[in-house]
From Swiss-Prot:
One of its GO terms (molecular function) is rRNA binding. InterPro entries: Ribosomal_uS19, Ribosomal_uS19_bac-type, Ribosomal_uS19_CS, Ribosomal_uS19_SF. Gene3D superfamilies: 30s Ribosomal Protein S19, Chain A (3.30.860.10). Keywords: Ribonucleoprotein, Ribosomal protein, RNA-binding, rRNA-binding. It comes from the Bacteria. Belongs to the universal ribosomal protein uS19 family. This is Small ribosomal subunit protein uS19. Coiled coil: none annotated. The gene is rpsS. It holds the Pfam family Ribosomal_S19. GO terms for biological process: ribosomal small subunit assembly; translation.
Length: 92
């Protein structure tokens, strides 16, 4: 279930302030954040945001295609190690 349209998209205030400050100065530096729940706005395009995945910060370069999605969608939290091997090959 998506967010109500009358509420509008959500973005943490501290993250938005950091982006606006960088846009004013024209700097491009990595922004560390723990806010996986924040929606990506058009102002974020061109910036690199390091999103926390539970272990480390994963650098995510924001493009136009990502606008409207959440930051957490681009920093996976689980590492897939693969399924168990087939025992039939080893028995022969």
């Amino acid at each position: 279930m998506g967010r109500s349209l009358k509420k509008g998209p959500f973005c943490d205030e501290h993250l938005m302030k950091k982006i606006e400050k960088l846009n004013e100065t024209g700097q491009k530096q990595v922004i560390k954040t723990w806010s996986r729940r924040s929606t990506i706005f058009p102002q974020f395009v061109g910036h690199t945001i390091a999103v926390y995945d539970g272990r480390k910060h994963v650098p995510v370069y924001i493009t136009e295609d990502m606008v409207g999605h959440k930051l957490g969608e681009f920093a996976p939290t689980r590492t897939f190690r693969g399924h168990a091997g087939d025992d039939k090959k080893t028995k022969r």
